[in-house]
């Protein structure tokens, strides 16, 4: 995986701004430009830690695929970084990456009636030609 959200790594470990992505051999190049922070804020990490119970990262390829799927099913075009939140509910299902975590960290049935909110930003700010390239890339990746 080329990219990790250093904010999540810093908050999860309590290291906050004392670590950066380069410490882990990661180049900090990602389609998720809104999340491409190479060093997390210690101030924000300290404030958010009590409210955070888990985190995940996605590869750029997944975000592009989700971009194309959302455009095809909902006619909604978002920038790649906005799609990162879309995959969370999938990962919390039994047998998925965070499935075991949610089964132990949350009370039984806590997700049964959960509402998952995604901060869907930026699509209208992306030039049409660039969005078409994102979409085409997502469609091509989905065919693989």
Per-segment meaning from a language model:
Residues 1-3, 7-50, 107-144:
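Glycine-rich phosphate/pyrophosphate-binding loop at beta-loop-alpha junctions
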Residues 39-111:
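Active-site-adjacent helical/loop segments in soluble small-molecule enzymes
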